[in-house]
Amino acid sequence: MIPVINQEKQGISGDFRLSVAPMMNWTDRYCRVFHRVLAPSARLYTEMVHAKAVIYGDRERLLGFASVEQPVALQLGGSEPALLAKAASIAVDWGYSEINLNCGCPSDRVQAGSFGACLMREPALVADCVAAMAAVVSVPVTVKCRLGVNEDDDYGRFAKFVDWVIGASSSRMIVVHARNAWLQGLSPKENREIPPLRYDWVYRLKRECPELAVVLNGGITSVEAGLDHLLMVDGVMLGRAAYQDPYILHQFYCALSNAPVLPRALLLRALRPYVEAWLEQGVTLRHIVRHLLGLFHGQPGGRVFRQVLTQGGQRSDADWSLVEQALSIIEG
């Protein structure tokens, strides 16, 4: 039995034992609704949005979401406390239930903007950013970080960073990608795979800070592994596994909630009302079905299922019948 800690004490509402990581170019509004169908209580996160984009950009495109997505958090990028505070205030007006600051992205573009993983070298600045946002919003302000940058091998430095962050926020929760970020020499993809995982550091953080809600991210590719982590920390955050093999997300949700595991086809058909509503709004099917391609990962007919959706989804007039065509291959 996986314990549920007192979320109210942590300043977080809802169940955070299971969440889906913010992933650039992946966790858009269509992906998040699909994930909500698969896991009704998982915490969902947007793609990272820079604070300036929230303030000056197309807010409907950047911030719009369906009410069914709740609880959903907006992940912000930036390093200027005043701008982050303004963006957080706007986001809360749009209905987001959590604001999360990105302190883990190692891409060159993000580094050039002085935010993301490079902020781990500036814990006082991160604390200022968190405090500025927490002062103007009523929802939790959290941080997603790495263990350190480059060759950092000092647990004490990591723990000090967490102390700074938590001390600045009314929300005692942190999400940790359990590996370092290399700021030179590795692509973002390689940064998710090559730096070694150090789950022991995250476990230690939880042991030393029992009142802190610790959510672990990184390298979780099975329900069994996730459940094992939940014996040591308060939550797990699935990343690529939830996108590339999304049925894992449903299986994990069912394991935590003692709900029956539903067939893949039934879950996909539950998405139909949302898909048809989006199509009526002028969204083309290809923007939606790209998130569905992994649902039959490893299953007979899965490759042809993906081909039908990928090729047919390019048509401007493609509609739900294409999904049914792809399902007919699976169902024989």
Swiss-Prot record:
The protein's UniProt keywords, in alphabetical order, are:
Flavoprotein, FMN, NADP, Oxidoreductase, RNA-binding, tRNA processing, tRNA-binding
- Name the catalysed reactions: 5,6-dihydrouridine(20) in tRNA + NADP(+) = uridine(20) in tRNA + NADPH + H(+); 5,6-dihydrouridine(20) in tRNA + NAD(+) = uridine(20) in tRNA + NADH + H(+); 5,6-dihydrouridine(20a) in tRNA + NADP(+) = uridine(20a) in tRNA + NADPH + H(+); 5,6-dihydrouridine(20a) in tRNA + NAD(+) = uridine(20a) in tRNA + NADH + H(+)
Which residue positions hold the site described Interacts with tRNA?
Answer: 102, 189, 192, 303, 306
List residues binding FMN.
22-24, 75, 144, 177, 217-219, 239-240
Q: Which GO terms describe its molecular function?
A: flavin adenine dinucleotide binding; FMN binding; tRNA binding; tRNA-dihydrouridine20 synthase activity; tRNA-dihydrouridine20a synthase activity
Q: Look up keyword NADP and say if it applies.
A: yes
Please, which domain of life does this record's source organism belong to? Answer: Bacteria
Against HAMAP family, the record matches this protein to:
DusA_subfam
Note the PANTHER family from the entry: FMN-LINKED OXIDOREDUCTASES SUPERFAMILY PROTEIN
Instruction: Name the chain's protein.
Output: tRNA-dihydrouridine(20/20a) synthase
